[in-house]
Amino acid sequence: MRSYLVVGNQTLDSPELAEAVRERMATGPATFHIVVPATPVQRGLTWDEDEARAAAQARLADALERFRSSGATVSGEIGHRDPVEATEDALRGRDVDEVLLSTLPPGISRWLGQDVPTRLKGSILVPVTVITALRQSVSTARA
């Protein structure tokens, strides 16, 4: 059975990620583990760690429900605010075949601006596939 680590936050409900998951499920039995980094919820120059964790928890709960409704075997966790550290933490003691990094498009994505895909590829031994959402989540856009 193939195993996938999905790392995402604002894009966990994107059609692009849903399609990538469907494609992997179509190749045979698969399990997914979702990590939602507790990235800061920006309100001007400050942010609140509790608010960041609460937003990440809400996104994780929605994603778990969505994955399960599509027939996926899935688990998940809230991770460190840095997506690279969150990924490395999630990989400790867990074997996966591929990491799916779900991001916003260039110009909007802080993760791409921080070069997260390259940093991940340099720090882990698992293939990393970047899934770029064409839009921001509706729930996030309203926040």
Model-identified regions with their sequence ranges:
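Glycine-rich, Arg-bearing micro-motifs that act as flexible, cationic patches
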Residues: 102-119
